[in-house]
Amino acid sequence: MYGGICLCVLLAVLAISSSGQHISRSLNGNSLAAAIEQNFPEKHRPARTPDSNQRVESNIDEKANLGVLLARYLQKARRGTNGKPPDPKKESQDYLGWMDFGRRSAEEYEYSS
């Protein structure tokens, strides 16, 4: 249950961060930014943001890191709650005799034909 909740939260954070980037990019081309640059002298201007090439590189790095984190999360989710990978032998032993149930009960009654 926690795995599903974590995945939903992760997707929500990704959606919010990507929508936030679109909003900030649309504001960069706004005439308001041009008016602010004209009104403030060079000394009082805030430091400029990195150019678009650096933004693209940082976005690629963030996506790569996110991919690594997602892969780790999926590996942990597969392992289960105890941190050990599931044992295929144990899973098959749980249902070893279920197919023989009908045959054994039929042998007990020994129907005559």
UniProtKB/Swiss-Prot annotation:
PROSITE patterns: GASTRIN. GO terms for biological process: digestion; regulation of blood pressure. Expressed by the mandibular venom gland. Its main location: secreted. It is found in: Secreted. Residues 1-20 form the signal peptide. GO terms for cellular component: axon; extracellular space. The keyword Signal applies. Cholecystokinin-22: hypotensive neuropeptide that binds cholecystokinin receptor type A receptor (CCKAR). Cholecystokinin-8: hypotensive neuropeptide that binds cholecystokinin receptor type A receptor (CCKAR). This is Cholecystoxin.
